[in-house]
From Swiss-Prot:
It is found in: Cell membrane. Signal peptide: none annotated. This is Cell division protein FtsQ. Belongs to the FtsQ/DivIB family. FtsQ subfamily. GO terms for cellular component: cell division site; plasma membrane. It is a single-pass type II membrane protein. Keywords: Cell cycle, Cell division, Cell membrane, Membrane, Transmembrane, Transmembrane helix.
Amino acid sequence: MAGPTTAERGARQQESSGPPRVRRFRPPRLRTIIILAVALVLVAGGTVWVLYGSNWTRLERVSVSGTDVLTPAQVREAADVPVGDPLVSVDTEAVEARLRRKLPRIDEVDVERSWPHGIGLKVTERTPVLIVQKGRNFVEVDDEGVRFATVSKAPKDVPTLELEPARSGSAAASLRRFDDDRLVREAVRVAGRLPDKVARDTRVVKVRSYDDISLELSGGRTVSWGSGEQGVRKARALTALMKATPDARHFDVSVATAPASSGS
């Protein structure tokens, strides 16, 4: 008697096997969950210990860059960074605030952690554009009109600012409206608009009122500038005027559209 054919055997196997089994999702066992939780706690605890408890990340050095007049030692002393403390606990904003308060010469400062043991202090100092004589000393004024330091020796090639506000007439009215700080800012504004050659030759910036600012140049020459307004146009007019009348002793650009020279 012949046995079942291959096709018949395949059909019976398919019938007996039935539909494919679906694997059920088995939730992780409690033991696995506990092991993972303990591992996370250990990792977190280890991280906290490394940052706060170990000697691996304690502050050991404070580096300073960008100084010119100031010394790195002065900056470190003013910063008062707590060497030996965990690096992560150093309050960088407080360090920046101390530097700005104790050293007004500093214009900008970046306080950065340098892992694993350092703090970097990158400073930018203010640069004087004018000086005000005060007794035997000199007060330095930056390009924003901030009087930031008093020095015993005048910095080289920085013009002197003379505040001589008039106390009567229209100039007195101007003084009531614009105080000394505002007049200083106007003088700085004028100094920043001068043509390069004129800036190099300027010895004194004299302010009598908001709209009465003049310059004393090398060789006894003078310039009536007026107010700080229309500075670019006045600078162009002064350049052209000096080129047209090189032997003149006085130049007036207080009205930019009507420049004049005299005293040749």
